[in-house]
UniProtKB/Swiss-Prot annotation:
Modified residues (2-(S-cysteinyl)pyruvic acid O-phosphothioketal): 118
Organism the protein comes from: Dinoroseobacter shibae (strain DSM 16493 / NCIMB 14021 / DFL 12)
GO annotation, cellular component aspect: cytoplasm
Family: Belongs to the EPSP synthase family. MurA subfamily.
Subcellular location: Cytoplasm
Purpose: Cell wall formation. Adds enolpyruvyl to UDP-N-acetylglucosamine.
Binding site for UDP-N-acetyl-alpha-D-glucosamine: 94, 123-127, 308, 330
Name of the protein: UDP-N-acetylglucosamine 1-carboxyvinyltransferase
Pathway: Cell wall biogenesis; peptidoglycan biosynthesis
EC number annotated for this UniProt entry: 2.5.1.7
Length: 422
């Protein structure tokens, strides 16, 4: 098993290219199941989660080819000969549930195991199922599998999400494109990844209005055709690397970065004393003067502060001058990185969904263990600023969502390497 070794205290200087969004690509890939014509995705990230989704789609009968060193995905679902997404694949990744809506909409039946992924709270799929039932699906849950049927096809309906859910919005949006009549999704998620999905589906012939707002309207069509679509920039990878020069000092340009994707996050960085400016090729980030200042953070659905940047922001605030309060409103049990940061000398007090962080003058290197995807990279950020050597174990979490992180950081001067665990 791999470990990442970091020797901290080096200010970063250079440029980091930002990949296509993992969360967008994992939604776009199942969209191939809606059509019997090819779908080509460019600017795809090279991640283990993408490989998992590739394996899942192939198990259903889809063809998936990787081109240009994995940056282009060529998908074709002209023949779907298996409508069961097995537990052995689905358990590895929560996004696997996104094959349910497309298969059900196109062929009228699907069987999908309940998914896995990061161990962050309950993260139920209830809203996916309730939304599909609103479109006329007959669903039963047996032995950990969702059995879905719609022999007469799905039918448009008005469905209001009781709370905002990105995954459920994506699943039901895809299913609605082939439903008979009009579907209206109220209190829909507004994330850029949903906007990206809607744009791709529209290229495939779907009739969609309102993406990026809380009300999405879909007029169902008889069939969708093929398309070519670039995956939107990964705003979580972007935000993560924006924190690298903020926590170490120095100045880094983030190629392909877009401020509109991370506006709420950038505002909190600016409040802490970090300079963020737009360039011809992306964004430049540098720490303004001395230590960053303490700021309070509340995670919210887009366009608010992303929950997927909470752990990384905590790493920065461990080095801030003063006391910060982070309130996690999206997921329960999402402070599992705090005990590991404490091993590095951080002062963090967690009560329920709130963490109080008192900044310390200097973090210290230590052996630490990643508990989930975002926690793993928060430990790497902390290690970049720490005195001495830090060894991060269980970095397989990292490879699910970050493309060649050690290469990108070392190109900016970080002393970081991947080694085999001894």
């Amino acid at each position: 098993m791999d470990q990442i070794v970091i020797r901290g205290g080096v200010p970063l200087h250079g440029a980091i290219p930002i990949a296509g969004a993992k969360n967008a690509c994992l939604t776009l890939m199942p969209a191939t199941l809606l059509s019997d014509e090819p779908l080509t995705l460019t600017n795809a990230p090279r991640l283990s989660d993408i490989a998992t989704m590739t394996a899942l789609l192939r198990s259903l009968g889809a063809e998936v080819s990787t081109l240009q060193d994995g940056k282009v995905l060529a998908l074709s679902s002209h023949r779907i000969d298996n409508h069961t997404a097995e537990y052995d694949i689905v358990r590895k990744m929560r996004a696997s549930i996104l094959v349910l809506g497309p298969m059900l909409a196109r062929d009228g039946h699907a069987v999908v195991s309940l998914p896995g992924g990061c161990a962050i709270g309950a993260r139920p799929v209830d809203l996916h199922l309730k939304g599909l039932e609103a479109l006329g699906a007959d669903l039963t849950l047996t032995d950990g599998y969702v059995h879905a049927k719609a022999p007469g096809g799905l039918k448009g309906a008005v469905f209001e999400f009781p709370f905002v859910s990105v995954g459920a919005t994506e699943n039901i949006l895809m299913a609605a494109t082939l439903a008979k009549g009009t579907t209206v999704l109220k209190n829909a998620a507004r994330e850029p990844e949903i906007v990206d999905l809607a744009r791709c589906l529209r290229k495939m012939g779907a009739q969609i209005e309102g993406e990026g707002t809380s009300r999405i309207t879909v007029q169902g069509v008889d069939r969708l055709h093929g398309a070519t679509h670039p995956v939107v920039t990964d705003r979580i990878e972007l935000g993560t690397y924006m924190l690298a020069p903020a926590i170490t000092g120095g100045e880094v340009e983030l190629i392909g970065g877009r401020l509109d994707l991370v506006a709420a996050f950038a505002e909190r960085l600016a409040a802490a004393g970090v300079d963020v400016s737009e360039t011809a090729h992306g964004l430049t980030v540098k720490r303004a003067n001395g230590r960053v200042g303490a700021v309070d953070v509340v995670t919210e659905p887009f366009p608010g502060f992303p929950t997927d940047l909470q752990a990384q922001m905590m790493a920065l605030l461990c080095t801030a001058d003063g006391v910060s309060v982070l309130e996690e409103r999206i997921f329960e049990n999402r402070f599992m990185h705090a005990p590991e940061l404490i091993r590095m000398g951080a002062r963090i007090d967690v009560h329920g969904g709130t963490a109080t962080v008192t900044g310390v003058p200097q973090l210290k290197g230590a052996p630490v263990m990643a508990t989930d995807l975002r926690a793993s990279v928060s430990l790497i950020l902390a290690a970049l600023a720490a005195e001495g050597e830090t060894v991060v174990s269980r970095v397989y979490h990292l490879d699910r969502g970050y493309e060649r992180v050690e290469e990108k950081l070392s190109a900016c001067g970080a002393q970081i390497e991947r080694v085999k665990e001894t």
